[in-house]
């Protein structure tokens, strides 16, 4: 991915490592006291503002053995639950996402502790929360969210109080390296020519977020295959020429992916991984606490390369909107 691109999306992606480098991991220290007292946290939002930020935080909490109970749902589903024993944190770039505002009006009436993260100062969300943080990265011009997703994820991660922040600068450097990787024409061709692109990975928000980004950036139909879902029956309807992107695949199952999906179905399989695989692979560094960001940015790189090769306007999809469902 090259700097000086005519596309805002590319330039905003390239700003992301700097956002990580400058992020203040103590910015929401006051929130953590309220969360610790409750012991339960619901992270909500819609689309890219929730998928990676919330699920990355949950993944890191589980890996660290945190006693904090964290869950995530979209705002409409969260509104159906009893959240009286929770602290609720929401992210919305616009601060006026319809589903989210409806939930937070309900939470405000019930006086349930609630905090917000937004790119838009003075938005409706800021009026409904106990406290709000405005993203330092600024508002994006491209429809597809990138640097805001990263900063929202950093805020959610900082609620966990982990010790990985000592590697923050190193992580930012690795992110720059990943965004600077030249994507092999073979990989770009597989994505560009595929009628459908599958993304397979852990339930940590990376593969799921890239599934959405494939629609917005590369204009590709896509499907998210959680965990090892790809090995449990979907091969029946997969077709030769479709593409599968494996995100840091489970080492124990790599040969199964090869035998069943590449050789059996005829899928064009590629990987984003910190180790060598039998497939065309974008090899990336590994760093505890920041692996999700590195994997996500490698995926951005692949999708941008495919989109540019296809000649699409990366900044402006024909139908997708920056604010999907606004008040």
Model-derived features: positions:
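Catalytic cores of large soluble enzymes that bind and process phosphate-bearing ligands
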Residues: 1, 5-15, 48-49, 53, ...
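Glycine-rich phosphate-binding loops that contact phosphosugars or nucleotide phosphates
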Residues: 36-182, 235, 242-282
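Short, well-ordered alpha-helical segments
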Residues: 55, 153, 208, 296-300
């Amino acid at each position: 991915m090259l700097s000086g691109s005519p596309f805002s999306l590319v330039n905003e992606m390239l700003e992301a490592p700097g956002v990580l480098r400058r992020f203040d991991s103590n910015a929401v220290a006051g929130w953590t006291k309220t969360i610790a007292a409750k012991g339960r946290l619901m992270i909500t939002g819609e689309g890219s503002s929730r998928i990676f930020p919330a699920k990355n935080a949950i993944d890191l909490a589980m890996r660290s053995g945190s006693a904090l109970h964290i869950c995530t749902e979209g705002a409409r589903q969260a509104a159906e639950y009893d959240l009286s024993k929770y602290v609720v944190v929401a992210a919305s770039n616009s601060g006026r996402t319809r589903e989210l505002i409806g939930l937070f009006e309900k939470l405000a009436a019930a006086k349930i502790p609630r905090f917000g993260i937004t790119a838009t100062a003075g938005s409706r969300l800021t009026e409904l929360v106990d406290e709000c943080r405005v993203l330092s990265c600024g508002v994006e011009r491209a429809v597809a969210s990138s640097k805001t997703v990263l900063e929202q994820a950093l805020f959610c991660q900082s609620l966990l109080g982990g010790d990985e922040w000592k590697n923050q600068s190193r992580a930012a450097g690795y992110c720059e390296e990943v965004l600077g990787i030249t994507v092999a024409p073979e990989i770009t061709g597989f994505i560009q020519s595929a009628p459908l692109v599958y993304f397979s990975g852990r339930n940590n928000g990376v593969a799921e977020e890239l599934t959405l980004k494939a629609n917005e950036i590369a204009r590709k139909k896509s499907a998210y295959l959680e965990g090892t879902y790809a090995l449990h029956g979907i091969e029946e309807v997969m077709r030769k020429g479709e593409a599968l992107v494996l995100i840091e695949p489970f080492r124990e199952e790599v040969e199964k992916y090869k035998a069943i999906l590449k050789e059996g179905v005829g899928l064009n399989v590629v990987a984003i991984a910190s180790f060598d695989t039998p497939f065309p692979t974008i090899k990336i560094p590994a760093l505890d606490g920041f692996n999700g960001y590195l994997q996500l940015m490698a995926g951005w790189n692949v999708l941008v390369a495919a989109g540019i090769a296809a000649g699409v306007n990366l900044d402006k999809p024909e139908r997708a909107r920056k604010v999907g469902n606004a008040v």
